[in-house]
Amino acid sequence: MPFPLPLNFPKWLSENEHLLQPPVGNFCLFRTRDYTVMAVGGPNARSDYHYQPTEEFFYQYKGDMLLKVIDEDGKFQDIPIKQGEMFMLPAHTPHSPVRFANTVGIVVERTRPDGSPDAMRWYCPNKEAHGETPTLVKEVHFQCTDLGTQLKPIIDAWVNDEAGRQCSHCGYTQGARELPA
């Protein structure tokens, strides 16, 4: 069986950029037994932090993005990734990719081992109550097989559940798209 031809990404993007739609904005370019390669466009419309058991590789092809993470010390940290830059996110790092309008990146993820679920997490943005300490409001676990189809219903459920966005520690009700600063 012959190998598939290489993908001309600039050409693909010029013909398919309309496929990169919120809330996540991703489109699977390649999927193998071990890896998934996605094009991801902005703007996205997410307020979650994604937790996964594997590393994640970011290459920012067009424009800049901001990767919000919770670092090893349990503190919020912003990592700007500029056009042309690459970044390898360590496994088990909660992260929230903030993609701006007219931006495109490539993301490479490992296939998740069976029994190693991903999680979507939302943290309270009320700094008056919590300072810089991430305070979990909600967490949803799932066995990731296809981010393109699995994230949207989880995000939509968050958006449509105002009572579920209330912090049990301070009572603050988070906006549907509100991220901790």
Swiss-Prot record:
O2 binds at R46. Pathway: Cofactor biosynthesis; NAD(+) biosynthesis; quinolinate from L-kynurenine: step 3/3. Its EC number is 1.13.11.6. One of its GO terms (cellular component) is cytoplasm. Its main location: cytoplasm. Gene3D superfamilies: Jelly Rolls. GO terms for molecular function: 3-hydroxyanthranilate 3,4-dioxygenase activity; ferrous iron binding. Substrate binds at E56, R99, E109. It comes from the Eukaryota. SUPFAM superfamilies: RmlC-like cupins. Keywords: Cytoplasm, Dioxygenase, Iron, Metal-binding, Oxidoreductase, Pyridine nucleotide biosynthesis. It holds the Pfam family 3-HAO. It catalyses: 3-hydroxyanthranilate + O2 = (2Z,4Z)-2-amino-3-carboxymuconate 6-semialdehyde. Fe cation binds at H50, E56, H95. GO terms for biological process: 'de novo' NAD biosynthetic process from L-tryptophan; anthranilate metabolic process; L-tryptophan catabolic process; quinolinate biosynthetic process; quinolinate metabolic process. PANTHER family: 3-HYDROXYANTHRANILATE 3,4-DIOXYGENASE (PTHR15497:SF1). Catalyzes the oxidative ring opening of 3-hydroxyanthranilate to 2-amino-3-carboxymuconate semialdehyde, which spontaneously cyclizes to quinolinate. This is 3-hydroxyanthranilate 3,4-dioxygenase. The lineage of its organism: Eukaryota, Fungi, Dikarya, Basidiomycota, Ustilaginomycotina.
